[in-house]
Amino acid sequence: MLSGCGGDDERPQPAPPPAPDLFGRPRAIAVQDGPFAAGPFTPPARGAYVGAWIKPDELTHVGRLAAVGSLESSLGRRLDILNTYRRFEQLVGTESDQEFLAQGQSLMISWATGDNRSILDGEHDRLIRAQARAIRRIKRPVLLRMRWEMDRPNLRATMWSGADYIAAWKYVRDIFRREHVENVSWVWCPTAEGFMRGDAPDFYPGDDQVDWTCVDVYAGASFQPIGELMEPFLRWAAQRPKPIVIGEFGVAKAWGSANRAAWLRDAERTFKANRQIKAVAYFESDPEGNGPNQQFQLSGDEAAFKAFHSLVKDPYFNVTD
């Protein structure tokens, strides 16, 4: 009887998942050397640009300048690329945009275009033309991520389908062409999860429509090496004659300081091994309302920030010096 009473407690427990290997040699998958037809925003001949989205305390001119300036001061260098998010109706060329451009930095514009079918019905032509002219006026080459992460399930109501997204992409790009915009490199940027599911390629507009391929990749809900998280994307992108930008990457606070530092060191090695990756941008933000597995800011985490600092100071990521 005594042994029977304890039976439930003595059942073998499932083994914990193995710890991720963050110290092995990363796989070299996307290794094309170019030269690439990448549009006006040209990739470096060797190495990669480095950048970030830095969430300001206030979404104002002063707030944006302060956020970027504070991070760059801590890093001891200017970032090559600044990721900036715009709603459909928000035009490029703000005061802070102009200030960053005057400092010699480049913009990656993440533009949240709206419902694809309403775009195709011509409901937003005036707005699209206004954005095209605004980008043309800044003259400097920019990276434009038209409705990045279009493959997310929670965007399906406005994306409708891969075919609708592709048609809207071509429609918007044609308006830019008719407005004589010649300083945009078109960046197609789904999620790493979309490649794991297998549906992200359904949204690809085609090699003749895209200048840079891109992916957003996070160690958020699960702690895996970046090479594993984006391997399906890299295998796909290796077959495209395009440079790659890692549009957003991050490792969540939930995984602890030492693990975050190891993950970032592994990310640096992975970027170097896959030399088709020509730009990377960290997501330096703790979005409001998110739990620890969706908070990615490195500032304030000494070990993790030190690992990122090592990445941005490495000669491989200082191609404009």
Predicted features, each with a name:
Residues 2-4:
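C-terminal motif of bacterial Sec signal peptides marking the signal peptidase cleavage site
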Residues 6-91, 321:
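Boundary/entry segment of secreted carbohydrate-active catalytic domains
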Residues 49-138, 263, 269-274, 283, ...:
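N-terminal carbohydrate-binding/catalytic regions of secreted carbohydrate-active enzymes
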Residues 51-55, 173-198, 243-254, 279-285:
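Aromatic-lined carbohydrate-recognition surfaces of secreted/lumenal glycan-active proteins
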Residues 57-58, 87-90, 113-117, 148-153, ...:
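Solvent-exposed loop/turn segments at secondary-structure junctions
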Residues 82, 144, 211-213, 248, ...:
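Conserved, mostly hydrophobic/aromatic
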Residues 95-105, 110-112, 215-255:
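Glycoside hydrolase catalytic-domain groove-lining segments
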Residues 126-212, 216-232, 259, 289-307:
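Active-site cleft segment of glycoside hydrolase catalytic domains centered on the general acid/base Glu
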